[in-house]
A protein has these predicted regions:
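Glycine-rich SAM-binding Motif I of class I
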Residues: 82-90
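S-adenosyl-L-methionine-dependent methyltransferase catalytic module, highlighting the catalytic core
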Residues: 134, 138, 149, 157-270
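N-terminal, positively charged/glycine-rich alpha-helical extensions of SAM-dependent methyltransferases
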Residues: 2-45
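Class I SAM-dependent methyltransferase SAM/SAH-binding core
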Residues: 91, 95-123
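Short SAM/SAH-binding signature in class I
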Residues: 143-151
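Conserved alpha-helix/loop element of class I SAM-dependent methyltransferases that forms part
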Residues: 53-74
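Class I SAM-dependent methyltransferase Rossmann-like catalytic core
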Residues: 43-57
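Conserved SAM-binding strand-loop segment of SAM-dependent methyltransferases
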Residues: 122-133
Length: 271
């Protein structure tokens, strides 16, 4: 069953009689932004999460260099899946990636990415595409130097397919995801209540267990940035890493930290 957001229509104002400003563009989606503007634009107001100043991209950049990916993102062909509002795209572009192709399935998020590209002066090396990232990976026969998937894995109903396709279409990856942590769920009944069952699954020869997460009332928010269904399947940390190994990744750098929704894994890997 697919989620049908109540905000399916384009409901922002069609004409502005005021002086043109960058804030006007951000205000097309007033109340829907997750990201705050870059720190060098304190004059602008949007969301509250500092994704345009996110240290995770610098972390990935340096860990990639540590494992022998010369210059990290710099000079690399990068595929980004689920850019949300373009914050990580902006940071990778500022590291002078040779090209960034960012695929976003959420139509409102895609439009916010275009606003961010214009407002925050991303380069012509950045291209945003509207569509399903899994369909893109299945059909576009291209191998990228680095693939980035931040905040995506735990919004899918077949997360291992994403890991398989990342291995097929990239030589190195940066992955950030929340994962199913039974200790966290036991100690935090509110987010824990959103999990309803666990199921055995198999994809491309990899057997694993997934835990159903139900979005619930979150689906009613115009700025909802989850998946396209009313639920998703979460994996445990050890099985995420095991799946990547199964599909050919051999060198890993990982870091775990707490998150409001559960334990989070930050990972770079290369073949």
């Amino acid at each position: 069953m697919s989620a049908t957001p109540p905000s399916a229509s384009t409901d922002f104002k069609h004409f502005f009689g005021a002086v043109p400003t960058d804030q006007n563009a951000l205000d097309l989606f007033a109340g829907e932004w997750s990201s705050s503007p870059p720190s060098d634009r304190p004059d602008l107001k949007a969301g509250v999460t500092p994704l345009f100043d996110d240290p995770r991209i610098a972390w990935a950049h340096h860990r990639l260099m540590d494992m022998g990916v010369e210059n990290g993102f710099t000079g690399r062909d990068v595929l980004e899946l689920g850019p949300l509002e373009g914050g990580h795209t902006y940071l990778i572009d500022r590291l002078n990636a040779a090209a960034v192709t960012a695929v976003e399935a959420n139509a409102r998020a895609y439009l916010k990415c275009l606003i961010a590209k214009e407002t925050f002066r991303m380069s012509a090396r950045v291209r945003f595409l509207l569509g399903d990232c899994l369909a893109h990976l299945r059909t576009v026969d291209q191998t990228h130097d680095i693939a980035v998937a931040s905040g995506l894995l735990y919004h899918l109903t077949n997360p291992v397919e994403l890991l398989e396709l990342l291995a097929r279409r990239s030589n190195a990856i940066f992955l950030w995801t929340v994962f199913y942590d039974p200790d966290f769920v036991a100690q935090n009944p509110v987010p824990g209540a959103k999990f309803s069952e666990q199921l055995p699954m198999e994809h491309a020869g990899f057997k694993h267990t997934v835990h159903r997460f139900n979005y619930g009332p979150s689906l009613d928010w115009k700025g909802f940035c989850g998946g396209g269904d009313i639920y998703s399947y979460w994996m445990e940390k050890k099985e995420i890493i095991a799946a990547l190994e199964h599909f050919g990744f051999r060198d890993f750098r990982t870091e775990q930290h707490p998150n409001v929704h559960g334990s989070a894994l930050m990972l770079v890997a290369r073949k």
